[in-house]
């Protein structure tokens, strides 16, 4: 018998649905979650496990993963006091939103953006001020600044390069926004390693209201390890840390991060490959009249077709899983797929040419 728990739960849940991935997470060729096509080499995994097996598994990890935070701070050339590590960047998003939002507070979110931003704002009963992007899916910087100030919003969230549009803000535009509003500005740089634009990291010392979010899931190929970071000034970071759940990052994640940062040439090589393949795929697809391609600054590509749902299912029937992002604002009949291995990319091209050529 069904029970009605609505009166006992957070009323915001009535406006939400559980996170899901259309088509699932298993496929012969999986290109739907913006993952790296490259796993860590076995020799590096062995090196990591050789260290990890000597850790005390019966003891809690540190409240905050200080070894991982110092390793990443040293890698970036910044003070460890400006860095906080989390169990994936999604956990850090939860932490930052908890620190910045509550019922009735306003948050500015360009649309379309990463869906978790809206979900978290709704959960916290905040008021969302959405700012549509231009029709070509580029940011409307003037509108972001104007709406933030008009609405007196205290929090702005920017994803650059943006998921799902794959386009970036120029550093000068980030500077304009951060300096032009009286709000905390979160810049989510999950895909920054693939961008033609400079990171906002250079602005951290200049603007005390700037927070940068990073993930190790994309370029560093550590999606299964769940490693994310917030970077900001120590005073603001100490406040953001207050709602963070303790002990969420395990020692294995810390050790893995340290070893991958020591062998960063593996990341450089993978990023170089992805950029080459991105350019190749964009060039191939731009020659197909029935496919519209958008510029990409990430490890994934956005295309528009006449019937995205049909193409999505046709590719799925061929064992190729992409993402149907048609439900996002301004992205009707759009599909998203990350750069895979060369053989996977070739097969995707072949199927798209056959369907739309």
Swiss-Prot record:
Q: What is its EC number?
A: 2.6.1.9
Q: Which residues carry the post-translational modification N6-(pyridoxal phosphate)lysine, per the record?
A: 218
Q: Which reaction does it catalyse?
A: L-histidinol phosphate + 2-oxoglutarate = 3-(imidazol-4-yl)-2-oxopropyl phosphate + L-glutamate
| Gene Ontology molecular function terms on file | histidinol-phosphate transaminase activity; pyridoxal phosphate binding
Top-rank EC class of the record's enzyme: transferase
Which keywords has UniProt assigned to this entry?
Amino-acid biosynthesis, Aminotransferase, Histidine biosynthesis, Pyridoxal phosphate, Transferase
Which GO annotations describe the biological process of this protein? L-histidine biosynthetic process
Q: Which residues cross the membrane?
A: none
Q: Which SUPFAM superfamilies match?
A: PLP-dependent transferases (SSF53383)
Name the coenzymes or cofactors required: pyridoxal 5'-phosphate
Q: Please describe the quaternary structure of this protein.
A: Homodimer.
Q: Which family does it belong to?
A: Belongs to the class-II pyridoxal-phosphate-dependent aminotransferase family. Histidinol-phosphate aminotransferase subfamily.
What name does UniProt use for this protein? Histidinol-phosphate aminotransferase
> Which species is the source of this protein?
Prosthecochloris aestuarii (strain DSM 271 / SK 413)
Q: Which gene encodes it?
A: hisC
């Amino acid at each position: 018998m069904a029970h009605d728990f609505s009166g006992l739960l957070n009323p915001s849940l009535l406006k939400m649905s559980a996170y899901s991935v259309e088509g699932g997470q298993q496929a012969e060729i999986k290109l739907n979650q913006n993952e790296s096509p490259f796993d860590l080499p076995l020799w590096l995994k062995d090196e990591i496990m050789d260290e990890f097996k000597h850790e005390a598994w019966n003891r809690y990890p540190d409240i905050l993963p200080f070894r991982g935070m110092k390793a990443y701070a040293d890698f970036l050339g910044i003070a460890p006091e400006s860095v906080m590590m989390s169990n994936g960047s999604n956990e850090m998003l939860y932490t930052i939103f908890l620190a910045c939002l509550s019922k009735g507070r306003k948050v500015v979110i360009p649309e379309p953006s990463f869906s978790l931003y809206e979900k978290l704002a709704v959960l916290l009963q905040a008021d969302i001020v959405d700012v549509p992007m231009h029709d070509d899916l580029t940011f409307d910087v003037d509108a972001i600044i104007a709406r933030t100030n008009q609405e007196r919003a205290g929090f702005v969230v920017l994803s650059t390069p943006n998921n799902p549009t794959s386009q970036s803000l120029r550093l000068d535009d980030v500077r304009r926004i951060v300096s032009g509003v009286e709000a905390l500005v979160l810049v989510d740089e999950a895909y920054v390693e693939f961008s033609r634009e400079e990171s906002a990291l250079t602005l951290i010392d200049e603007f005390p209201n700037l927070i940068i979010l990073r993930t190790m899931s994309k370029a560093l190929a550590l999606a299964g390890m769940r490693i994310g970071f917030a970077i900001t000034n120590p005073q603001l970071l100490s406040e953001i840390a207050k709602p963070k759940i303790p002990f969420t990052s395990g020692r294995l994640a810390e050790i893995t991060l340290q070893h991958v940062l020591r062998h960063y040439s593996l990341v450089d090589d993978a990023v170089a490959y992805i950029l080459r393949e991105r350019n190749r795929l964009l060039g191939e697809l731009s020659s197909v009249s029935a496919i519209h391609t958008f510029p990409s600054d990430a490890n994934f590509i956005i295309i528009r077709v006449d019937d995205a749902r049909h193409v999505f299912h046709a590719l799925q029937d061929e064992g190729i899983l992409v993402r149907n992002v048609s439900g996002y604002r301004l992205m009707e009949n759009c599909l998203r797929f990350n750069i895979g291995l060369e053989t996977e990319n070739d097969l995707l091209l072949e199927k798209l040419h056959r369907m739309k050529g």
